[in-house]
Amino acid sequence: MFAVRYFVKDVSASIKYYSDAFDFELAQQYGPAMAILTKDNLTLWLAGPASSAVQAEKKVNPDIMPGFNRIVVLTDDIKNVTARALDCGGRVRIDIGSGPTGEQSILEDPDGNLIELFSSRP
């Protein structure tokens, strides 16, 4: 099993963002400290300031901020998914562009975590 962990400022707000913007489902929540969301085969761990992961990291880096990791959301409708994510409080980091295998854009969630939207060529 694999998971992606994002450090977030507010677990409840992040649950709402990922559920509303990308249709993630809440699998488990541990109060304000941590939540586990799922979408298809992706498991996303949202770790708030009270989580043990954030507390451990703060011992090494007291100014810990969201990193440059990113999840990739595969979609057949990159324009509408981008619009929905922006309506939910996200920001565009890199606008939609074309590459040899399809279209992609990079968004930021409200905490600055990166989300790549990818639409493969038929």
Name each model-derived stretch.
Residues M1-F2, E25-V73, V81-E108, S119-P122:
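Vicinal oxygen chelate
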